[in-house]
Amino acid sequence: DLQHNGELLLSKDFRGSEIESLSIVISGDTSEMAPGITSLDGCDLLIHEATFLDDFSQHADDYLHSTASGAARTAIACGAKHLVLTHYGARIKQTDESLSEAKSVLAESKTTLSAARDGDRILIENPNEITHLYWRNDGWIR
């Protein structure tokens, strides 16, 4: 609140309607279960690298990167509502295997999953409605 020219101006008279807050965590080049992420008490959206598949989990450990399943375990540990996999290594040509490995870890959780490629968009309508958009020949597809 503010006093101006003898008039009390109330801050509530100048604010719009309240909006629901949203927490987004973006993690690139990060090992599985990084303390800065797993110490969170929930987040709406975790965007996490998935450089390797499980066959190369030792490489992930050696180079401080994650596998898709490691990103999923991290999502569960930090209480993420939605996980977006990204930042794939050169060996990964399609995201199907990454999705499959992450889905197997997330099977018993409520965390939803998608795999983003370069140029994709993540549309956040509210904390409970996160949509992955990707471009195909004639426009954006959900």
What are these regions (language model features)?
Residues 51, 88, 118:
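Short, ordered loop/turn segments at secondary-structure junctions
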Residues 85-91:
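G-domain G4 guanine-recognition motif of GTPases
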Residues 95-119:
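Short, electropositive alpha-helical surface patch
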